[in-house]
A protein has these predicted regions:
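Terminal domain-initiation and capping elements
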Residues: 1-104
Length: 104
């Protein structure tokens, strides 16, 4: 079951850093991808999913998972809206609760 979830989540490239770009006429806003705590998904599975989708180190994924566990949520990625939506869908397909919101 876990391998099927990971296979579904493992579609696309690893995370790349994206920053807001501005020009004389437009300013592109950045968006946060937020993972929310749930009572179902084991912590080690969250680490594996984050590692597969974003390509982060195990240590970074563990820190993010612990933040989700203790604080109820964690921003796991920030960048352009389209990419944030793609990551959110992949996280949801993998079984995690996820939303996006404008970065502050």
């Amino acid at each position: 079951m876990l391998s099927r979830i990971l296979a579904l989540a493992d579609t696309g490239a690893g995370a790349e850093s994206e920053s807001a770009t501005s020009s004389a006429t437009t300013v592109e806003r950045t968006w946060d991808v937020i993972v929310w705590n749930d009572p179902v998904t084991p912590m080690d599975v969250v680490v594996v999913i984050l590692r597969r989708i974003f390509g982060y180190s195990t240590g970074r994924c563990t820190q993010l998972m612990l933040r989700v566990h203790h604080e109820g949520r964690a921003v796991v990625w920030t960048g352009r809206r389209q990419r944030a939506e793609q990551y959110c869908v992949r996280l949801q397909v993998a079984g995690l609760r996820c939303t996006i919101e404008q970065a502050t």
